[in-house]
């Protein structure tokens, strides 16, 4: 059985997937407006997990992080680093690859969302309200400098993914 927090965050995953699909519907061009909405939404989603969900889980778990938290944080770092770069077919493919591996870590039967909601002391109602009220993340313009590309590549590798997925950048 899934709880309120699980459903809220999983539904947000579906919304983000739809936005990314919309942004890439035309194989010849990326819909900049749809991608910008995806970018903003994914950064907000990551922020909700990093600033609300994972700290609440840690507090409910005797001030110890859940075992999956470290891997999720590495994935979040890789995704955020990729969102710094101007979207291209290469960066979008990398984002999709990471999300395809990442989302089951959160939504799966043993995923972090279920783990959180099963913790004694994890108040789903309070956490859900905080998630709903989470603010958008401020975004800067895209940066495609060699340092930004290297940072994205390093974040992807730290998270355990193949840096070759960024070949051509």
Task: Describe each PLM feature range.
Residues 1-169:
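Small-residue-biased structural context
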């Amino acid at each position: 059985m899934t709880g309120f927090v699980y459903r809220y965050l999983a539904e947000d995953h579906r919304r983000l997937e739809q936005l990314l699909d919309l942004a890439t519907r035309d194989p010849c061009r990326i819909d900049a407006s749809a991608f910008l909405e995806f970018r903003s939404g994914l950064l907000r989603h990551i922020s909700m997990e990093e600033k609300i969900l994972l700290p609440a889980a840690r507090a409910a778990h005797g001030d110890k992080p859940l075992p999956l938290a470290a891997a999720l944080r590495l994935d979040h770092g890789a995704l955020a680093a990729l969102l710094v770069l101007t979207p291209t077919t290469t960066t979008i493919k990398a984002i999709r690859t990471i999300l395809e591996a990442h989302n089951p870590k959160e939504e799966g039967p043993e995923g972090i969302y279920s783990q959180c909601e099963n913790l004694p002391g994890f108040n789903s109602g309070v956490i859900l309200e905080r998630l709903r009220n989470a603010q958008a993340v401020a975004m800067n313009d895209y940066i495609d400098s060699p340092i930004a590309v290297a940072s994205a590549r390093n974040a992807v590798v730290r998270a355990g993914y193949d840096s070759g997925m960024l070949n051509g950048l």
